[in-house]
Amino acid sequence: DALFEAASHINMRMIAGKVMMDRNAPDYLLDTAESSYHQSKELIERWHKNGRLLYAITPRFAPTSSPEQMAMAQRLKEEYPDTWVHTHLCENKDEIAWVKSLYPDHDGYLDVYHQYGLTGKNCVFAHCVHLEEKEWDRLSETKSSIAFCPTSNLYLGSGLFNLKKAWQKKVKVGMGTDIGAGTTFNMLQTLNEAYKVLQLQGYRLSAYEAFYLATLGGAKSLGLDDLIGNFLPGKEADFVVMEPTATPLQQLRYDNSVSLVDKLFVMMTLGDDRSIYRTYVDGRLVYERN
Protein backbone atom coordinates (compact mmCIF):
# COMPACT_ATOMS: atom_id res chain seq x y z
CA ASP A 1 0.00 0.00 0.00
CA ALA A 2 2.77 2.47 0.90
CA LEU A 3 4.45 2.08 -2.50
CA PHE A 4 1.19 2.54 -4.39
CA GLU A 5 0.28 5.53 -2.22
CA ALA A 6 3.62 7.23 -2.90
CA ALA A 7 3.31 6.62 -6.64
CA SER A 8 -0.30 7.81 -6.62
CA HIS A 9 0.74 11.03 -4.88
CA ILE A 10 2.76 12.11 -7.94
CA ASN A 11 0.50 10.36 -10.47
CA MET A 12 3.24 7.95 -11.53
CA ARG A 13 2.74 5.27 -14.16
CA MET A 14 3.77 2.22 -12.17
CA ILE A 15 3.29 -1.54 -12.23
CA ALA A 16 3.95 -3.24 -8.89
CA GLY A 17 2.77 -6.13 -6.76
CA LYS A 18 3.15 -7.91 -3.46
CA VAL A 19 5.77 -10.67 -3.49
CA MET A 20 4.26 -14.14 -3.04
CA MET A 21 6.67 -16.43 -1.15
CA ASP A 22 5.62 -19.33 1.07
CA ARG A 23 8.76 -21.51 1.31
CA ASN A 24 12.56 -21.59 1.15
CA ALA A 25 13.02 -18.17 2.74
CA PRO A 26 13.33 -16.78 6.31
CA ASP A 27 10.17 -17.37 8.34
CA TYR A 28 9.59 -13.67 8.93
CA LEU A 29 9.31 -13.11 5.16
CA LEU A 30 6.95 -15.98 4.38
CA ASP A 31 3.26 -15.79 3.64
CA THR A 32 0.98 -18.73 2.78
CA ALA A 33 -0.76 -19.72 -0.41
CA GLU A 34 -4.08 -18.52 0.97
CA SER A 35 -2.84 -15.31 2.59
CA SER A 36 -0.88 -14.31 -0.52
CA TYR A 37 -3.99 -14.81 -2.63
CA HIS A 38 -6.22 -12.72 -0.37
CA GLN A 39 -3.64 -9.96 0.18
CA SER A 40 -2.92 -9.73 -3.55
CA LYS A 41 -6.62 -9.70 -4.34
CA GLU A 42 -7.18 -6.80 -1.93
CA LEU A 43 -4.33 -4.84 -3.51
CA ILE A 44 -5.64 -5.49 -7.01
CA GLU A 45 -9.11 -4.30 -6.04
CA ARG A 46 -7.67 -1.19 -4.38
CA TRP A 47 -4.94 -0.14 -6.80
CA HIS A 48 -5.13 -1.81 -10.24
CA LYS A 49 -6.10 0.84 -12.80
CA ASN A 50 -6.45 3.38 -9.99
CA GLY A 51 -5.21 6.44 -11.87
CA ARG A 52 -2.04 5.40 -13.68
CA LEU A 53 -1.28 2.47 -11.36
CA LEU A 54 -1.29 -1.16 -12.49
CA TYR A 55 -0.84 -4.43 -10.64
CA ALA A 56 1.56 -7.33 -11.25
CA ILE A 57 0.96 -10.77 -9.75
CA THR A 58 4.42 -11.46 -8.34
CA PRO A 59 5.57 -14.89 -7.22
CA ARG A 60 9.18 -14.19 -6.22
CA PHE A 61 10.33 -17.17 -8.28
CA ALA A 62 9.35 -20.82 -8.58
CA PRO A 63 11.63 -22.17 -5.78
CA THR A 64 10.01 -19.93 -3.15
CA SER A 65 6.43 -20.71 -4.12
CA SER A 66 4.79 -24.05 -3.42
CA PRO A 67 2.57 -25.66 -6.07
CA GLU A 68 -0.36 -24.50 -3.95
CA GLN A 69 0.82 -20.90 -4.12
CA MET A 70 1.49 -21.12 -7.84
CA ALA A 71 -2.10 -22.31 -8.22
CA MET A 72 -3.25 -19.24 -6.27
CA ALA A 73 -1.23 -17.01 -8.62
CA GLN A 74 -2.94 -18.74 -11.53
CA ARG A 75 -6.31 -18.14 -9.90
CA LEU A 76 -5.54 -14.43 -9.56
CA LYS A 77 -4.53 -14.19 -13.21
CA GLU A 78 -7.73 -15.94 -14.27
CA GLU A 79 -9.86 -13.65 -12.11
CA TYR A 80 -8.00 -10.50 -13.20
CA PRO A 81 -6.77 -11.24 -16.74
CA ASP A 82 -5.74 -7.62 -17.39
CA THR A 83 -3.13 -7.67 -14.61
CA TRP A 84 0.57 -8.22 -15.26
CA VAL A 85 2.79 -11.09 -14.09
CA HIS A 86 6.39 -10.60 -12.99
CA THR A 87 8.92 -13.12 -11.69
CA HIS A 88 12.46 -14.44 -12.24
CA LEU A 89 13.54 -17.04 -14.79
CA CYS A 90 16.77 -18.94 -15.45
CA GLU A 91 19.06 -16.50 -13.65
CA ASN A 92 21.80 -18.99 -12.77
CA LYS A 93 22.51 -22.68 -13.27
CA ASP A 94 22.14 -23.74 -9.62
CA GLU A 95 18.73 -22.08 -9.50
CA ILE A 96 17.62 -23.99 -12.61
CA ALA A 97 18.70 -27.31 -11.08
CA TRP A 98 16.85 -26.38 -7.89
CA VAL A 99 13.64 -25.69 -9.78
CA LYS A 100 13.89 -29.02 -11.57
CA SER A 101 14.28 -30.81 -8.23
CA LEU A 102 11.27 -29.01 -6.75
CA TYR A 103 9.07 -29.43 -9.83
CA PRO A 104 10.21 -32.78 -11.31
CA ASP A 105 7.00 -33.28 -13.28
CA HIS A 106 7.52 -30.13 -15.33
CA ASP A 107 9.51 -29.84 -18.54
CA GLY A 108 12.01 -27.28 -17.28
CA TYR A 109 11.90 -23.96 -15.45
CA LEU A 110 9.67 -21.93 -17.76
CA ASP A 111 7.22 -24.82 -18.01
CA VAL A 112 6.41 -24.36 -14.32
CA TYR A 113 5.08 -20.87 -15.01
CA HIS A 114 3.48 -21.90 -18.29
CA GLN A 115 1.50 -24.77 -16.78
CA TYR A 116 0.16 -22.40 -14.14
CA GLY A 117 -0.99 -19.93 -16.78
CA LEU A 118 1.71 -17.38 -16.00
CA THR A 119 3.13 -16.80 -19.48
CA GLY A 120 1.84 -14.55 -22.22
CA LYS A 121 1.34 -10.90 -23.04
CA ASN A 122 2.07 -8.69 -20.01
CA CYS A 123 4.18 -11.43 -18.39
CA VAL A 124 7.70 -10.12 -17.74
CA PHE A 125 10.54 -12.45 -16.74
CA ALA A 126 13.71 -11.05 -15.20
CA HIS A 127 17.16 -12.32 -16.23
CA CYS A 128 16.66 -15.25 -18.66
CA VAL A 129 20.42 -15.80 -18.75
CA HIS A 130 20.43 -19.59 -19.22
CA LEU A 131 17.37 -20.39 -21.33
CA GLU A 132 17.04 -23.63 -23.25
CA GLU A 133 16.08 -23.43 -26.92
CA LYS A 134 12.55 -24.62 -26.18
CA GLU A 135 12.22 -21.86 -23.57
CA TRP A 136 13.24 -19.19 -26.06
CA ASP A 137 10.61 -20.58 -28.42
CA ARG A 138 7.93 -20.58 -25.74
CA LEU A 139 8.67 -17.00 -24.71
CA SER A 140 8.32 -16.00 -28.34
CA GLU A 141 5.17 -18.05 -28.96
CA THR A 142 3.43 -16.73 -25.84
CA LYS A 143 4.57 -13.12 -26.45
CA SER A 144 6.16 -12.99 -23.00
CA SER A 145 8.86 -10.39 -22.29
CA ILE A 146 12.30 -10.23 -20.68
CA ALA A 147 13.81 -7.72 -18.25
CA PHE A 148 17.57 -7.59 -18.93
CA CYS A 149 19.32 -6.87 -15.59
CA PRO A 150 23.04 -6.50 -16.35
CA THR A 151 24.32 -5.04 -13.07
CA SER A 152 22.68 -7.82 -11.07
CA ASN A 153 23.85 -10.56 -13.44
CA LEU A 154 27.43 -9.31 -13.29
CA TYR A 155 27.48 -8.63 -9.55
CA LEU A 156 26.09 -12.09 -8.71
CA GLY A 157 28.16 -13.82 -11.39
CA SER A 158 25.02 -15.27 -12.95
CA GLY A 159 26.14 -15.08 -16.57
CA LEU A 160 25.70 -13.03 -19.73
CA PHE A 161 22.28 -12.32 -21.22
CA ASN A 162 22.06 -13.10 -24.94
CA LEU A 163 20.33 -10.08 -26.47
CA LYS A 164 21.12 -11.19 -30.02
CA LYS A 165 19.21 -14.42 -29.39
CA ALA A 166 16.25 -12.47 -28.04
CA TRP A 167 16.08 -10.40 -31.23
CA GLN A 168 16.41 -13.54 -33.37
CA LYS A 169 13.53 -15.16 -31.49
CA LYS A 170 11.48 -11.93 -31.62
CA VAL A 171 11.20 -11.75 -27.82
CA LYS A 172 10.60 -8.27 -26.40
CA VAL A 173 13.28 -6.94 -24.04
CA GLY A 174 13.49 -3.97 -21.70
CA MET A 175 16.17 -2.85 -19.25
CA GLY A 176 15.95 -3.71 -15.54
CA THR A 177 17.91 -3.13 -12.34
CA ASP A 178 16.68 -6.16 -10.34
CA ILE A 179 15.61 -3.75 -7.60
CA GLY A 180 18.43 -3.88 -5.03
CA ALA A 181 20.22 -6.99 -6.30
CA GLY A 182 22.29 -4.98 -8.75
CA THR A 183 24.66 -2.10 -8.08
CA THR A 184 22.62 0.86 -9.30
CA PHE A 185 19.11 2.12 -9.99
CA ASN A 186 20.49 4.58 -12.55
CA MET A 187 19.50 3.68 -16.10
CA LEU A 188 22.60 5.23 -17.67
CA GLN A 189 24.89 3.04 -15.57
CA THR A 190 22.65 0.07 -16.33
CA LEU A 191 23.18 0.70 -20.04
CA ASN A 192 26.92 1.01 -19.41
CA GLU A 193 26.97 -2.46 -17.86
CA ALA A 194 24.72 -3.85 -20.60
CA TYR A 195 27.29 -2.69 -23.14
CA LYS A 196 29.99 -4.69 -21.33
CA VAL A 197 27.81 -7.82 -21.04
CA LEU A 198 27.18 -7.79 -24.77
CA GLN A 199 30.73 -6.80 -25.72
CA LEU A 200 31.95 -9.97 -23.98
CA GLN A 201 29.77 -11.92 -26.43
CA GLY A 202 30.99 -10.09 -29.51
CA TYR A 203 27.82 -8.01 -29.81
CA ARG A 204 28.34 -4.26 -30.18
CA LEU A 205 25.48 -2.44 -28.46
CA SER A 206 24.97 0.89 -30.20
CA ALA A 207 23.81 3.92 -28.26
CA TYR A 208 20.62 4.04 -30.31
CA GLU A 209 19.78 0.44 -29.46
CA ALA A 210 20.67 0.99 -25.81
CA PHE A 211 18.41 4.00 -25.40
CA TYR A 212 15.67 2.14 -27.26
CA LEU A 213 15.87 -0.66 -24.68
CA ALA A 214 15.62 1.90 -21.88
CA THR A 215 12.62 3.70 -23.39
CA LEU A 216 10.33 2.36 -26.11
CA GLY A 217 11.73 -1.17 -25.80
CA GLY A 218 10.82 -1.22 -22.14
CA ALA A 219 7.39 0.19 -22.91
CA LYS A 220 6.80 -2.52 -25.52
CA SER A 221 7.95 -5.25 -23.14
CA LEU A 222 5.35 -3.99 -20.65
CA GLY A 223 2.65 -3.71 -23.30
CA LEU A 224 2.38 0.03 -22.64
CA ASP A 225 3.94 1.42 -25.81
CA ASP A 226 0.61 3.00 -26.74
CA LEU A 227 0.96 5.17 -23.62
CA ILE A 228 4.67 5.69 -22.92
CA GLY A 229 8.12 5.18 -24.42
CA ASN A 230 8.59 8.13 -26.77
CA PHE A 231 7.35 11.63 -27.53
CA LEU A 232 4.63 10.88 -30.07
CA PRO A 233 1.58 13.16 -29.71
CA GLY A 234 -0.96 11.86 -27.23
CA LYS A 235 1.44 9.83 -25.11
CA GLU A 236 1.95 10.40 -21.40
CA ALA A 237 4.79 12.83 -20.70
CA ASP A 238 7.07 10.77 -18.45
CA PHE A 239 10.66 11.79 -19.19
CA VAL A 240 13.94 13.03 -17.78
CA VAL A 241 16.03 15.98 -18.92
CA MET A 242 19.71 15.07 -18.88
CA GLU A 243 22.85 17.18 -18.87
CA PRO A 244 25.40 15.47 -21.13
CA THR A 245 28.34 17.39 -19.64
CA ALA A 246 27.67 16.94 -15.92
CA THR A 247 31.29 16.01 -15.10
CA PRO A 248 34.65 17.22 -16.47
CA LEU A 249 35.27 13.85 -18.14
CA GLN A 250 31.85 13.88 -19.81
CA GLN A 251 32.53 17.45 -20.97
CA LEU A 252 35.85 16.43 -22.50
CA ARG A 253 34.45 13.40 -24.30
CA TYR A 254 31.30 15.23 -25.39
CA ASP A 255 33.26 18.12 -26.87
CA ASN A 256 35.29 15.65 -28.94
CA SER A 257 32.24 13.77 -30.20
CA VAL A 258 30.81 14.85 -33.54
CA SER A 259 27.78 12.67 -34.25
CA LEU A 260 24.64 12.26 -32.16
CA VAL A 261 25.28 8.55 -31.69
CA ASP A 262 28.75 9.33 -30.30
CA LYS A 263 27.35 11.92 -27.91
CA LEU A 264 24.71 9.44 -26.70
CA PHE A 265 27.42 6.81 -26.26
CA VAL A 266 29.35 9.17 -23.99
CA MET A 267 26.20 9.73 -21.95
CA MET A 268 25.41 6.03 -21.56
CA THR A 269 28.95 5.02 -20.59
CA LEU A 270 30.02 7.97 -18.44
CA GLY A 271 26.68 9.28 -17.20
CA ASP A 272 25.20 8.63 -13.77
CA ASP A 273 22.85 10.29 -11.25
CA ARG A 274 24.65 13.61 -11.77
CA SER A 275 23.45 13.64 -15.37
CA ILE A 276 19.78 13.83 -14.34
CA TYR A 277 18.76 17.50 -14.43
CA ARG A 278 14.97 17.25 -14.24
CA THR A 279 12.34 14.53 -14.01
CA TYR A 280 8.78 14.91 -15.25
CA VAL A 281 5.86 12.60 -14.41
CA ASP A 282 2.80 12.96 -16.62
CA GLY A 283 4.05 16.37 -17.69
CA ARG A 284 4.62 17.68 -14.15
CA LEU A 285 8.05 18.53 -12.78
CA VAL A 286 8.73 16.27 -9.77
CA TYR A 287 12.51 16.60 -9.43
CA GLU A 288 15.05 19.30 -10.24
CA ARG A 289 18.75 19.13 -9.44
CA ASN A 290 20.02 21.92 -7.24
Regions found by a protein language model. Name each.
Residues 2-128:
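Metal-coordinating catalytic core of metallo-dependent amide/deamination hydrolases
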Residues 7, 57, 88, 125, ...:
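Divalent metal-coordination and catalytic microenvironments
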Residues 19-22, 150-154, 179-181:
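Short, acidic/turn-prone active-site loops that include or flank metal/cofactor-
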Residues 58-62, 128, 155, 177-183, ...:
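Glycine- and other small-residue-rich loops at beta-strand/loop junctions that grip anionic moieties
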Residues 91-123, 128-144, 154-167, 182-185, ...:
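Catalytic core of soluble alpha/beta enzymes
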Residues 115-122, 163-252:
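His/Asp/Glu-enriched, well-ordered alpha-helical/loop segment
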Residues 236-290:
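C-terminal cap of metal-dependent C-N hydrolases
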